[in-house]
Amino acid sequence: SNTIGKKESVFGQDIDGDGSTFDVNNITVTAVSTDTSTTANTAVTLSKDSQGGLYITKGSTNIMIVDSNDAAVAFDWSQTWAGETRTSIAYAVEGIDSDSDNTIDKYKLAVKHELKNNSSNAVTNQWQTIEISTAGVVDWSTETFGEAKLHEADLNQDLDGDGSIWS
C-alpha cells in the first residue's frame, strides 16, 4: 500500500503531501464492492482510502488494517510472468464472535488470488484468509490458503459464486 498515513503522527509532519497529517477519524474511505455481507451483528465493510490503505468500517468507525509495526498492509497486486498473470485482491472482511457473546472478538479478511494462463485464458482461483485483531493488526500466524467455501460461513457471503453459503 502507498498509505503512509499512520506514520505521519510519529514524525509529526505531512509525509504524503496531501496537506494534512493523518487522522483516522477524518479519512474518506470507499467500500470494496466485493464485500457484500451487510447483515448480522458481525457485519462490517472492507473499505479503502485514496492511496489503497485498507480499513474495517462499521458505521462511522474506520479501523486501519496494519502489521505489527503499525504500517499499512497491501494485498492488491498483479504480476505477469512466464505466460501467466497472477492477481490478488482484498475481497471481504467480517467480524468473528468467537465466544457467542454478541461482540466482535476479531475479524477475518478474505483475499482472492487469481491465476490466469494467458495462452488458454484458463483461470484458477485460490483464497487466502487472515485474522485481524479488533485493533486492526494482522495476525500472520492465522494465514490460510484454500477453497472459498471453507470460509463462506465466517464471512457470511457466497465467495465462490455457486449461489449458497457453505457451512
Residues of each region from the PLM?
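Long, low-complexity, Gly/Thr
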Residues: 1-167
